[in-house]
Curated annotation (Swiss-Prot):
It catalyses: GTP + H2O = GDP + phosphate + H(+). It comes from the Bacteria. It is a peripheral membrane protein. Belongs to the TRAFAC class translation factor GTPase superfamily. Classic translation factor GTPase family. LepA subfamily. This is Elongation factor 4. Gene3D superfamilies: 3.30.70.240, Elongation factor 4, C-terminal domain (3.30.70.2570), Elongation Factor G (Translational Gtpase), domain 3 (3.30.70.870), P-loop containing nucleotide triphosphate hydrolases (3.40.50.300), Translation factors (2.40.30.10). It comes from Salmonella paratyphi A (strain AKU_12601). Residues 2-184 form the tr-type G domain. Keywords: Cell inner membrane, Cell membrane, GTP-binding, Hydrolase, Membrane, Nucleotide-binding, Protein biosynthesis. One of its GO terms (molecular function) is GTPase activity.
Length: 599
């Protein structure tokens, strides 16, 4: 056991985590050169296309160190994006140490800090690594000072390497073996294994990634899931070298995969503890804290026949992604679907794309909203995650919106622009600290503004230099109203949005104008209105298409023309009473862009 090292790689987006993982795999001979490819751990097509890591992946490698010993390295490559920080915290729970990778050109960024603090809270040994020293812009001295100033860990002798060229990667491994402690645990005690992650395989059922904390797990053992008290047979187990390799046992301190023919997707939830059925452990390991979704949106299949397969797909996906929340929802405009909760807009986009690709579905998404806390006049507190669930205005005593605490790190040159943006987003400054030429800003901004397009706008006002980390702080009373959209005097529930009263006029007008462009013209006039309660705040009309009924008249008497026009008018009137308007998919997506800059 003293030769096992479990560690994660944490860093800001694009600081080179996945490339460093590639080099480590190559040096330790996990894959032959023929099988090696760039970003070997980003196994999803989506991850490769966007160049980001979404799912944490684990690998077991053997490394022969300079002291002649062979060490077993279990390492987990983690995502860097703010929306996937729960993946990082889950990976860290399985480790004793973390490699903090910092780009020697960019320096410390917000996510570097957030992930590093998560690791320190879990009492992990953090080893700083300066990556990308082959770049002409690299300044390792300055960045080492920055790490000490901002993060507060000693970086004077931080390892310098270039994952791209492979320089210094062996030093990283030597340092890691030296500084990261071996796992603690009792190899002879009762089995306790923590489920770090699980996914669904069509042939094997549920595959779980486990970290053995105490005891040993052998092939063929009877295994009990502590939360559900169900017992299963350990059919196959093994490690990833990135390929799946079968083993006969997993020893204390190791990380590996397990298949025990669980067909029910809720059979082995992430964060649960596995123990042996013969000699069970007394208590479960502390799991992970449940992450609360920040953004909710309705997802509906385009054709209602897909509802069943959509439900199965969501079930399989939620197994792999513990933070995805969903419940059935029906809408008069869109039929049956699900209300889903996500951690942020990127997470929402990724989930929608994975559903469409991996499960071949066509989906419509409604506008994302955050959760509001509503105190009714009957003094009840309810949580509303969809505009259609908001009680009528006269039943609301107080409406509170979620406030996010945003930590931003940016160069001084862009401070003015970023402050202007934060004020425009109804933000309140709580802290500002200068570190050299970097500024650390803390603002409290309403969550609804953050999830809409704050990240994109922050990047564009600071030319991509600012970085952001945010978390939920509290609920705060606010003057929010629901803007409804009426089409021919009928409310369309899927188009409603909740917004601040100050912005409601402009948002309503903008939405109505957008709808006017998107709804195709019909044989009758279509009135599109935005309303708060019964008060109409904006209106526009999609003009009817009409045939020229006078074309056949060639001159002739005016009363003859009047008769024809009158007849057409009555026909249109009758049509309007029975006609209904088909809304195109773009109309629902239009709300996503309301309130965004049309630059």
């Amino acid at each position: 056991m003293k030769n096992i090292r479990n560690f994660s790689i944490i860093a800001h987006i694009d600081h080179g985590k996945s490339t460093l993982s590639d080099r480590i795999i190559q040096i330790c001979g996990g894959l032959s050169d023929r099988e090696m490819e760039a970003q070997v751990l980003d196994s999803m097509d989506l991850e490769r296309e966007r160049g980001i890591t979404i799912k944490a992946q684990s690998v077991t490698l053997d490394f022969k160190a300079s002291d002649g010993e062979t060490y077993q390295l279990n390492f987990i490559d983690t995502p860097g994006h703010v929306d996937f920080s729960y993946e990082v915290s889950r990976s860290l729970a399985a480790c004793e140490g973390a490699l903090l990778v910092v780009d020697a050109g960019q320096g410390v960024e917000a996510q570097t800090l957030a992930n590093c603090y998560t690791a320190m809270e879990m009492d992990l040994e953090v080893v700083p690594v300066l990556n990308k020293i082959d770049l002409p812009a690299a300044d390792p001295e300055r960045v080492a000072e920055e790490i000490e100033d901002i993060v507060g860990i000693d970086a004077t002798d931080a390892v310098r390497c270039s994952a791209k060229t492979g320089v210094g990667v062996t030093d990283v491994l030597e340092r890691l073996v030296r500084d990261i402690p071996p796992p603690q645990g009792d190899p002879d005690g009762p089995l306790q294994a923590l489920i770090i992650d699980s996914w669904f395989d069509n042939y094997l059922g549920v595959v779980s990634l486990v970290r053995i904390k105490n005891g040993t797990m052998r092939k063929g053992d009877k295994i009990k899931v502590m939360s559900t008290r169900q017992t299963y047979n350990a059919d196959r187990l093994g490690i990833f070298t990135p390929k799946q390799v079968d083993r006969t046992e997993l020893k204390c301190g190791e990380v590996g995969w397990l298949v025990c023919a669980i067909k029910d997707i809720l059979g082995a939830p992430v964060g649960d503890t596995l123990t042996s059925a013969r000699n069970p452990a007394e208590k479960a390991l502390p799991g992970f804290k449940k992450v609360k979704p920040q953004v909710y949106a309705g997802l509906f299949p385009v054709s209602s026949d897909d509802y069943e397969s959509f439900r199965d797909a969501l079930g399989k996906l939620s197994l792999n992604d513990a933070s995805l929340f969903y419940e059935p929802e029906s809408s008069s405009a869109l039929g049956f679907g699900f209300r889903c909760g996500f951690l942020g807009l990127l997470h929402m986009e990724i989930i929608q794309e994975r559903l469409e690709r991996e499960y071949d579905l066509d989906l419509i998404t409604t506008a994302p909203t955050v959760v509001y806390e509503v105190e009714t006049t009957a003094k009840e507190t309810i949580y509303v995650d969809s505009p259609s669930k908001l009680p009528p205005l006269n039943n609301i005593y107080e409406l509170r919106e979620p406030i996010a605490e945003c930590h931003m790190l940016l160069p001084q040159a862009y401070l003015g622009n970023v402050i202007t943006l934060c004020i425009e987003k109804r933000g309140v400054q709580t802290n500002m600290v200068y570190h050299g030429n970097q500024v650390a800003l803390t603002y409290e901004i309403p969550m609804a503004e953050v999830v809409l397009d704050f990240f994109d706008r922050l990047k564009s006002t600071s030319r991509g230099y600012a970085s952001l980390d945010y978390n939920f702080k509290r609920f705060q009373a606010s003057d929010m109203v629901r803007v409804d959209v009426l089409i021919n005097n009928e409310r369309v529930d899927a188009l409603a949005l909740i917004t601040h009263r100050d912005n409601s006029q402009s948002r309503g007008r903008e939405l109505v104008e957008k709808m006017k462009d998107l709804i195709p013209r019909q044989q009758f006039d279509i009135a599109i209105q935005a309303a708060i309660g019964t008060h109409i705040i904006a209106r526009s009309t999609v003009k009817q298409l009409r045939k020229n009924v006078l074309a056949k008249c060639y001159g002739g008497d005016i009363s003859r023309k009047k008769k024809l026009l009158q007849k057409q008018k009555e026909g249109k009137k009758r049509m309007k009473q029975i006609g209904n308007v088909e809304l195109p998919q773009e109309a629902f997506l239009a709300i996503l862009h309301v309130g965004k800059d049309n630059k």
